[in-house]
Design a protein with these regions (language model features):
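Surface-exposed loop and turn segments in beta-propeller and other repeat-based domains
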Residues: 34, 272-296
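Repeated scaffold domains used in trafficking and secretory/extracellular systems
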Residues: 42-50, 81-92, 121-138, 160-176, ...
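Short loop/turn segments that connect beta-strands within beta-propeller blades
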Residues: 66-70, 109-114, 153-156, 183, ...
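Blade-level signature of beta-propeller repeat domains, shared across WD40, Kelch, NHL, RCC1
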Residues: 300-342
């Protein structure tokens, strides 16, 4: 009997070992392909904004680096006390929400003044800030009521909504149930449910928004909407890569891509989906295996893309139970044509 049990145990052990060899941990495969950088921006990525040639990122702290440059991020010194829960920008001014002991305070910082210090936005009890031109501050009045105020880029009256904002871009604020202008009015023709993300579009008054099945583009100059089916499973975030005329839509396994017809075409009827590793993709053919074995396997939220002087850079907030790998990852073309920790 003991011999039979031993033989059975040995057989099971061999199956487990062989299975492990055939299915190595995803990020173990990464470390076989590239040497991982020491992580600077760890954990949950709460946002990245651009002011001039400088990028600012938050993971509770605020970090900065020159746009397009590889290497470590530097921690911004002299920030207010508390956890930075989000960033927004209007012109040279950086806005941030800080939480301490369940109390939230909004501050702003003039990046154009070398001796600038953080200044509180007084008379405001807001939980979050959003925006890339107009800055929207959000206060929670009850479990079903929120007040939204424009604190930079205009001065319309505050307005109430039953939905917490998804995000903001240009002069628009996105709610789960529709796109609003800076006065709180719903944009005519807006999709009205399940909206997941917003980013700036290719022209000065255009934005992209996304839901579970479609990518939409709103052109404010012509007041027109167009859309295309995107095919991304459980969209999380979107960004526009101007250099390649691509909308990147992050999901639960990497990101999908939509190619515009031209640098200024907002009509998604002329757009098409592209496959990672194809000629139009932001993932070069030579990088497809490393992409598939790394960020292409995991939930990305958020995602950001920026043009550089010679190409482009993509940042992905990787969300994984293994905290060793969660945090901000970057891809630089040229400079670092591989996905690696920031």
């Amino acid at each position: 009997m003991k011999k039979i049990l031993f033989a059975a145990t040995l057989a099971v052990s061999l199956v487990i070992v062989l299975s492990a060899c055939k299915n190595p941990p995803i990020f173990a495969a990464i470390e076989q392909e590239v040497k991982l950088n020491p992580a600077t921006v760890k954990g949950r990525v709460r946002g990245i904004v651009k002011i001039g040639d400088t990028l600012y990122a938050s993971n509770g702290k605020i970090w900065y680096k020159e746009k397009g440059k590889t290497g470590k991020w530097s921690e911004m010194k002299g920030c207010p006390s508390g956890l930075c829960t989000g960033l927004a920008v209007s012109g040279p001014n950086l806005y941030a929400a800080f939480e301490q002991n369940d109390a939230f305070t909004i501050y702003w910082y003039d990046t154009g003044t070398p001796s600038s210090t953080w200044k509180e936005v007084y008379g405001l009890t807001a939980k979050a800030v959003f925006g890339t031109r107009v800055v929207f501050a959000v206060s929670k009045e009850s479990d079903t009521t929120y007040t939204i105020r424009v604190i930079a880029g205009g001065s319309p009256p505050p307005w109430s909504t039953g939905k917490f904002p998804v995000g903001a871009a240009r002069t628009y604020c996105l709610l789960e149930d529709g796109l609003c202008n800076n006065t709180g009015s719903k944009v005519p023709g807006s999709p009205s449910s399940g909206l997941k993300g917003i980013c700036e579009g290719p022209t000065d008054d255009s934005v992209f928004v996304v839901d579970n099945t479609k990518l939409y583009c709103y052109n404010g100059n012509t007041s027109t909407w167009t859309n295309i089916v995107h095919g991304v499973s459980s969209p999380q975030s979107i960004t526009y890569l101007k250099n390649k005329h691509l909308v990147l839509i992050s999901g639960v396994k990497g990101y999908g891509e939509i190619k515009l017809a031209s640098a200024t075409d907002t009509n998604l009827a002329n757009a098409h989906t592209v496959s990672a590793g194809s000629a139009d993709s932001s993932v070069p053919p030579g990088n497809i295996l490393q992409y598939n074995n790394s960020v292409g396997k995991y939930v990305i939220n958020p995602i950001y893309a920026f043009d550089s002087s010679t190409g482009y850079v993509i940042y992905a907030g990787i969300n994984d139970p293994n905290t060793k790998y969660s945090g901000l990852w970057g891809f630089y073309n040229p400079g670092q044509i591989e996905w690696n920790r920031e």
